[in-house]
Amino acid sequence: MREIDVVKLYELAGNDALKLDEEIYLFSRLLYHNFELKTFFEDGSIPAEARKKMLVELHPDSSTLMRELIGLLIDQDLIRQLGWLAHHYSELISRKTGAPLVEITSAQVLPEDQKKEIMRFTEGRRRFEVDPAIIGGVRIKWEDGRYLDASLKGRLEALKEEILV
């Protein structure tokens, strides 16, 4: 199976490696959460130019490298590997920069003061996500496998386990 060489991609990105990481991540999350868009980008019967144009419409501020990368994935029928690419490129960024990824998930967009408080005890590159399913609170997941669940959903699940034992 053909795949993108993430090391070469990192070298090509140069000083824009972190920006590219964020762009790849955001686009992969968009496709992950939107079945219709995912189907559109993966459908080889839709002309490649139409799919590339859609990327520009969705992300008009995307970098030239990002547009060329997605164009390459479309042309080579590798767009299905975008999730894999996002994951492995992010891991490479962590190794190269020494800044591990920390994913912070909340039920709604956090106010800046709460973000700053979380940033005080987390080190590395941080990604803030919104997932209404956690009801309230936050979940923090470190790239090294550590996990803190201070969400209301997590507390309710723990309470359910205690009661059912």
What are these regions (language model features)?
Residues 1-165:
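Elongated, mostly alpha-helical coiled-coil "stalk/stator" tethers of large membrane protein machines
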